[in-house]
């Protein structure tokens, strides 16, 4: 009796695990804003891990300088590996278009290389939002595995993506134009709402502004408390006013006095933000001066001039010597 042929079952792909985080990027004419939370979950344990990384070719950050920022959702070690491999290629670029091309090529090559190493269905997942700035220009990209696409306006990945997309479409209709600072506030607000309402999103808010003309700015959790307090304050104040604006049975609720009070409260909150920023700038300035003073006292050799510069300064005549020689 002939035996029946064996049935060759096609191996099933392992179920995808949903990324427990939120990473986002927003683009305007002035540049790009990237943001992310910091909470990472391992089973029942939570830890704080930076998911937004910034790489740059120069400390000066002029318009022509190269900057590369990436925020990733998914497998943490795999995201870190992609950042290292991509930056190693991008920093060799001599033009903006070449930098964008090398970033996309590096992500594809990494998935091709490591895809042959992992067993079928075991390849780690990574969804990225990254930005490239150079030569006074910038572009925003998102990737899902080896698939890379340029994004004209925004890109959001993670379990807070649906909420973030809803808030962006609500506050940024197609006919509006926002500045880089306004997009930074929007990015922080989206992460704040995701941390409040989406399980698995939490920790600090990390944010970076890549400005086309230079002067980029990174905030790794320094502004969390006061911004979240201000968001909570405005939501609680503007929400009832929004509902009351449709209450035609109580026309006196939005009288001139109430509108004036609303404007005064908004101005007060804005002034508090300015005061906090000025205090933070002054504190940072004093802290840098104190650290430099301490370092000069503890590590004087770091601030010594090379002998070539000392000999050169000694050979150059001083201003008093020049004036004495002049008739």
Can you describe what each PLM-predicted range is?
Residues 117-122, 129-134, 186-200:
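Conserved short alpha-helical segments that host acidic/polar catalytic motifs at enzyme active sites
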Residues 134-136, 141-149:
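Long, contiguous, structured domain-core segments that constitute the functional module of a protein
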Residues 38-39, 74, 134, 211-213:
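A broadly conserved detector of short glycine/acidic/proline-rich loop/turn motifs that flank catalytic sites
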